[in-house]
Amino acid sequence: MVSPRGVCFLLFLLLGSVFGSVFMLGPLLPLMLLSPSRYRWITDRIVATWLTLPVALLELVLGVKVVVTGDGFIPGERSVIIMNHRTRLDWMFLWCCLLRYSYLRQEKICLKAALKSVPGFGWAMQVASFIFIQRRWEDDRTHMSNMLQYFCRIREPVQLLLFPEGTDLTENTRARSDEFAEKNGLQKYEYVLHPRTTGFTFIVDTLRGGDNLDAVHDITVAYPQNIPQTERHLLAGVFPREIHFHVQRFTVASVPAGAAGLQAWCQERWREKERRLQRFYETVPRRFDAPAVGVCVREPCCQSGQCVCVPRCKSEGRVRIILVASLLYWSVFITAACASLCLCPPAQFYFLFMVVFFLCQQRFTGGLELMELACHRYWSRRSADKQE
C-alpha cells in the first residue's frame, strides 16, 4: 500500500538530489580538473546542504524524535564510525545525529556499488566521493586504498561510516549469521549480525598510517516503534516514531593496532551491542540505559521523563533554524528548477546535457569519484616533475 506522505517524502528527496546534482554540483565539475582538493572542499559543503533535507522532513514534517546518549563527538575530528545495520536506511537516519553532534560535510559512507547507478542520489554520492564497494575483497581492497590515501594526502578530515555487518538485519541474514556462528563456535545473536572485520581493520590501519584518524565512534541504533526496513516501507508511510543512538568514542590511541587486535576489538564491540540492544528492547519504555553527559539543552527526550543527552556542537535552537532554513531553501529551489525546465529552453538543454553526462561518465569512467582520483594523480605527478 502506498501512502501519500511516503510518496511526498521520497519524491521530495529525489527531486532535490536530481536538481541539486545538475544545477548545484554540475557547474563545479570543471574545477575538479583544475584543483581536486578545492573541488572536494566546496562540494562537501554543498552536498551537506542536501543531507539536512531528509533530517528536516523527518523531524519537522513527520515528527520523528531523535534521542542520542553516551559519548559526544569532538567537532571537526577525523573518525571511523561503525554502526549496527538494523535497516537499509540507517545511514540516512544517522544524519539526524551527526547534524547535532558533528558536521555533515565530513561524512563519507562505505556502501554497495549498486547505489552509484541510482539517478540523483547516486550522482551526488559520486560527487561526494563516497566509497563504493563490490563486496569482493580482492576488487575492493585496491579501490578502498586509493580513496583512503587520497583523503590522507589532501588532508580531508573525514568521518567514514562503515557497517561491518555488511547487510541489514532480517530473518534471512540472521539465519546466515547463526550458521556462521555454529561453524565457528560463536554466540548466536538476536539483535545484531556477526561483523565482517576485514574492511574495518584495513580502513583503521590505513587512516592511522596516513595520520588522518583521531577516534573510532561505535554507534548503536535502535527503533522503539515502527521499523522501516526498506524504502518500500517509507513508500507505505512507515516512519519511526523515535530513533535512538548510543555513541561510544574511542581515541585512536586506545584502539589496538594490527589486524588481529582490531578484529578482536570489533567483535567485542558487537558483543556489547547485543547486550545493550537486549536491555533496550526489554526496558519499558524502551531506551538506552546511559548516564547523562554534559548539559542538556532540550526538553526530556524519553517517555520516562529522564533527560539523557551528550555534549553537542550546535544548540537545539540552532538545529531548528538549520532545519527550517533547509526546508525553505529546498522547497524554493525545487520549485524554481521545475519552473525553469518548463519555461527556459537553455535550462532544458543544460539539464538534458548534464543527465546524459552523468549517465555516460559512469559507463565509460566508472564514476566521478574515480575521475577525481585520476585528476589528483595527474596534478601530483606534475608537481613532482616540477620539483625535480
From Swiss-Prot:
Please give the GO cellular component terms listed in this UniProt entry.
endomembrane system; endoplasmic reticulum; endoplasmic reticulum membrane
| Alphabetized UniProt keyword annotations | Acyltransferase, Developmental protein, Endoplasmic reticulum, Lipid biosynthesis, Lipid metabolism, Membrane, Phospholipid biosynthesis, Phospholipid metabolism, Transferase, Transmembrane, Transmembrane helix
- Keyword check for Thylakoid, yes or no: no
The reaction(s) annotated as catalysed by this protein in its Swiss-Prot or TrEMBL entry are:
a 1-acyl-sn-glycero-3-phosphate + an acyl-CoA = a 1,2-diacyl-sn-glycero-3-phosphate + CoA; a 1-acyl-sn-glycero-3-phospho-(1D-myo-inositol) + an acyl-CoA = a 1,2-diacyl-sn-glycero-3-phospho-(1D-myo-inositol) + CoA; 1-acyl-sn-glycero-3-phospho-(1'-sn-glycerol) + an acyl-CoA = a 1,2-diacyl-sn-glycero-3-phospho-(1'-sn-glycerol) + CoA; 1-hexadecanoyl-sn-glycero-3-phosphate + (9Z)-octadecenoyl-CoA = 1-hexadecanoyl-2-(9Z-octadecenoyl)-sn-glycero-3-phosphate + CoA
Could you tell me the EC number(s) of this protein? 2.3.1.-, 2.3.1.51
Biological processes, Gene Ontology terms: CDP-diacylglycerol biosynthetic process; embryonic hemopoiesis; endothelial cell development; hemangioblast cell differentiation; phosphatidylinositol acyl-chain remodeling
Say which family it is in.
Belongs to the 1-acyl-sn-glycerol-3-phosphate acyltransferase family.
Q: What is this protein called?
A: Lysocardiolipin acyltransferase 1
What organism does the UniProt record list as the source?
A: Danio rerio
